[in-house]
A protein has these predicted regions:
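Structured, active/binding-site neighborhoods that engage oxygen-rich ligands
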Residues: 1-384
Length: 384
């Protein structure tokens, strides 16, 4: 089946837009404009937070709406920058040099004190990503980084969408897995982060092939039940294998729980209450029981992709619904927004997307060009 280059472009553009809206200059992400304590964990937190979701939605509508976002004044993120740098590495090099070029491009983004300050103050780079890149800049070998129990965050799953674009074919699945895993390990040495990154790339590869979204979870579960990922870990990073198996169970159990609640055999179950922001927030809280180090919905390499996927299933090809469900909620809204935006673009292209909005976005031209180059790269790799 021939691939649609417009969807490659839309995937890159809407991933960035999803982040910009979900972040909104750090106002929406993690509810940084709210006055309740972020140390409140459990039902008290989620009751306050879920009602705050309503405020975010009304504030978004009042401030700009779905068609008049003040995009020139809305900041992109470190994750968008790293997604772009990864995409450029894939475009500019051959397969044998993908990882080396990804590492080189990421280090470039922090290679001066001014760039580091911009990353911290302007783009709000995550501590895990920044600390890892500083080590690389100082000459450390990322293959020797220690496994970290608390590094199962979202840095990987927010930048591997481009890998799904260049490896869309079934016979490229192992290449997709290996590259998503190892490129994530550069900054996040934890199995939950690796598996989230693999899932993002996998779902993009399915979307770009027009596979119905409700089927994606079954492809994922089949992959997780196989030994394919296990073998890749054992062959490439054997010292991390025991920890990988332990944390893989956490990842798999969350997806199994999600599948049991939201699917009836092979059919997605619509829950009408999920259209209510407070119910949706409570649903994610009850389902994931946040770890102490990640109290926000969507802050992990596991639940971030689940929330983005769930939002896509509930939204179908309605962009406005996707914005509300994935970008305007309590928690790590920029993470879930960028992943959901990428899923939408790869699956539906520009369907129901306002031309006014993309025209106002000052990165549309650059992202469109990178999407086109990724399309050409995918064609080139498919011929090998």
């Amino acid at each position: 089946m021939s691939l649609d280059k417009k969807k490659f472009k839309a995937c890159m553009i809407l991933a960035a837009l999803g982040y910009v809206i979900g972040f909104y200059n750090c106002i929406y992400e993690f509810n940084n404009s709210n006055d309740f304590s972020i140390n409140t964990i459990g039902d008290n937190y989620i009751i306050e937070g879920s009602h705050y979701s309503n405020y975010i939605i009304f504030d978004f509508i009042n401030t700009c709406g779905f068609y008049n976002c003040p995009l020139p004044n809305m900041t992109i993120s470190d994750d968008t920058i790293f997604h772009l740098s990864m995409a450029k590495a894939l475009i500019e090099s051959n397969e044998n040099n993908f990882l080396a070029n990804i590492e080189k491009n990421m280090i470039k983004e922090i290679n001066t004190p001014d760039k580091i300050l911009d990353m911290i103050n302007k783009y709000r780079i995550g501590n895990v990503t920044l600390n890892s890149l500083k080590k690389l800049k100082n000459g450390d070998n990322w293959l020797k980084f220690q496994y970290k129990e608390n590094d199962g965050g979202t840095g990987g799953c927010m930048r591997t969408m481009c890998i799904g674009l260049i490896y869309p074919n079934i016979n490229q699945r192992e290449k997709l897995i290996k590259l998503a895993l190892l490129s994530t390990r550069i900054t996040h040495n934890n199995a939950i982060a690796w598996l989230g990154a693999i899932t993002s790339a996998l779902f993009i590869s399915l979307a770009i092939n027009n596979v119905e979204p409700s089927y994606w979870i079954f492809e994922l579960m089949s992959l997780l039940e196989s030994s394919i990922i296990d073998n890749i870990v054992q062959e490439n990073i054997p010292n991390d294998y025991v920890n990988y198996i332990k944390d893989k169970k956490i990842f798999v159990d969350k997806w199994k729980k999600y599948q049991q609640i939201r699917f009836d055999k092979y059919k997605f179950k619509e829950i009408k209450l999920m259209m209510m922001p407070n119910y949706r927030s409570k649903f994610y809280h009850d389902m994931f029981h946040f770890n102490n180090n990640r109290i926000y919905p969507g802050a992990g390499g596991d639940d971030s992709v689940i929330i983005a996927y769930d939002a896509l299933l509930d939204s179908k090809d309605d962009w406005e619904k996707l914005v509300v469900y994935s970008m305007l909620h309590v928690g790590d809204s920029d993470t879930t927004g960028t992943i959901a935006g990428a899923f939408y673009g790869a699956m539906y292209g520009n369907t129901n997307i306002s031309k006014i909005m993309t025209k106002k976005f000052n990165m549309t031209k650059e992202l469109s060009n990178i999407g086109l180059q990724l399309y050409k790269t995918s064609i080139k790799l498919a011929d090998k």
